Design a protein with these regions (language model features):
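Short glycine-rich or small-residue beta-strand-to-loop segments that form or flank ligand, phosphate
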Residues: 7-8, 78-79, 286-293
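General beta-strand structural signal in soluble alpha/beta enzymes
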Residues: 32-36, 78-79, 105-108, 150-152, ...
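Iron-sulfur cluster-binding cysteine motifs and their immediate structural context
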Residues: 205-229, 235-273
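Phosphate/pyrophosphate-binding active-site segments
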Residues: 1-22, 148-155, 160, 177-181
Length: 327
C-alpha cells in the first residue's frame, strides 16, 4: 500500500471544489460523481469522485445514469477538465442538451493540460505556435445552448452557493454547466508564489478543519504549521483560511520572515560522475515499459531513462527511440 495517496498540488484551484463535493457526499446529498482523466482524477482521494474512464467520458456516463434513473438528476455530477471537455466532452454536452436531460456538469477550467506536463489546450492563452488564442470555452458552450455558470475555484462560499443552486435547478428539470475557474499553479507567474501564512494561536481551536492541503500540517501542539511546499494559493483567496471556522488563519503580517524552523542538509553533488566505459555487449535495442504512474510520471521517468541510455553509450552506436503513453 502507498504511504499516502496521490494528491493534487498545494494551492491547486480544484481543492476547495473537492472538499465541498466530498462533504456533500458524506451527508448523502450526492450519490455519484462521474469523472474522466486528468488532474481531476485525483479528486477521488478527497472522496469527491467515483469513476474515471476516458477523456471527456464523464458527462456521457452521467447522461446514461440519469436516463436510467431520472430521480437521480439532482444527486449526481459529471466532472472533467477544460482540455477533456474540448477533446470529446463537448459531444456529450451537446447530446445532453439535444435530449433535454437535467443535471449538473462541472468543468474545472485551469487553462492547461496540466496532468501530462502543462501542454496548451484550446483554453490556453496561446496555441502551440505561440499565436494568441481566440477560442472562448464559455461562448462555445452557450452556442450549444448550455446554461453556463462561472465561479472561481478559490471562492468557497461562491462554489457552495453555485453547486447548491445548480442541483436545485436539476431537480426542477434544468441542465447546468458549472465552469470552475483557476489557472494551474504551475503556470502562474513566480511573483504570485511565496505568500506566507500565519495562525493566531489564541483563536485556533485545533479542530483540524484547515488541514486539507499538503502545504499545511499540525505541529507538536496541534497548531497548523505551513511547510515549505505551501504556495499561499498563488496569491488567490487561501483555501485553508476559508476552511477555518474561527478566522485564525491569514497571510502573515511580516512577509519577510521565514516560517520554517530549520532547513534540510543536502549533500553537495559531485561536479562529474565517473562511469565505466561500455563499448561491448550492448543489446541491439533497449525497450522499457513504464505503467501505472500517470502522465506526469511517464514523462519524468521517460526522460530519466533516456538520459541513462545516453550515458551507457546508446547515443553513439544505437538508435534511441522513446515513446511515452501517458494516462
Amino acid at each position: 500500500s502507498l504511504p499516502r495517496p496521490p494528491m493534487i498540488c498545494a494551492g491547486c484551484p480544484y481543492r476547495l471544489f473537492g472538499q465541498i463535493v466530498g462533504k456533500m457526499r458524506s451527508k448523502g446529498k450526492l450519490e455519484a460523481v462521474f469523472g474522466d482523466i486528468g488532474c481531476n482524477t485525483l479528486l477521488h482521494f478527497l472522496n469527491a469522485m467515483d469513476t474515471a474512464l476516458a477523456m471527456g467520458a464523464s458527462e456521457a456516463k452521467r447522461l446514461g445514469y440519469v436516463l436510467s434513473r431520472p430521480e437521480a438528476a439532482s444527486k449526481c455530477l459529471a466532472v472533467l477538465g477544460d482540455g477533456t471537455e474540448c477533446h470529446s466532452g463537448m459531444d456529450a454536452t451537446r447530446n445532453t442538451i439535444f435530449r433535454n436531460v437535467p443535471g449538473v456538469k462541472v468543468i474545472l477550467n485551469n487553462n492547461w493540460t496540466a496532468m501530462t506536463g502543462g501542454q496548451p489546450s484550446p483554453t490556453s492563452p496561446a496555441n502551440l505556435a505561440g499565436d494568441p488564442n481566440v477560442f472562448d470555452l464559455n461562448a462555445s458552450l452557450k452556442a450549444h445552448g448550455a446554461h453556463v455558470v462561472e465561479v472561481s475555484g478559490y471562492d468557497k462560499k461562491a462554489l457552495e452557493k453555485a453547486l447548491k443552486k445548480a442541483l436545485a435547478d436539476a431537480e426542477a428539470g434544468t441542465f447546468t454547466t458549472l465552469v470552475v475557474t483557476g489557472v494551474c499553479i504551475r503556470k502562474m507567474p513566480k511573483d504570485s508564489y511565496g505568500v506566507k501564512m500565519a495562525v493566531d494561536p489564541e483563536l485556533c481551536v485545533r479542530c483540524g478543519m484547515c488541514q486539507i492541503c499538503p502545504g499545511i500540517e499540525a505541529d507538536a501542539e496541534e497548531l497548523p504549521f505551513f511547510n515549505n511546499i505551501c504556495t499561499g494559493c498563488v496569491s488567490q483567496k487561501q483555501a485553508c483560511a476559508q476552511m477555518c471556522p474561527k478566522g485564525a488563519i491569514a497571510p502573515a503580517r511580516d512577509q519577510s520572515a521565514c516560517g520554517l524552523t530549520s532547513c534540510p542538509d543536502l549533500p553537495v553533488p559531485p561536479e562529474t560522475i565517473d562511469l565505466p566505459a561500455v563499448t561491448r555487449g550492448l543489446p541491439p535495442f533497449l525497450s522499457v515499459a513504464i505503467r501505472g504512474v500517470g502522465g506526469q510520471g511517464n514523462l519524468f521517468f521517460g526522460r530519466v531513462l533516456t538520459q541513462l541510455a545516453y550515458l551507457l553509450g546508446y547515443d553513439k552506436q544505437n538508435i534511441v527511440k522513446g515513446e511515452t503513453h501517458g494516462m
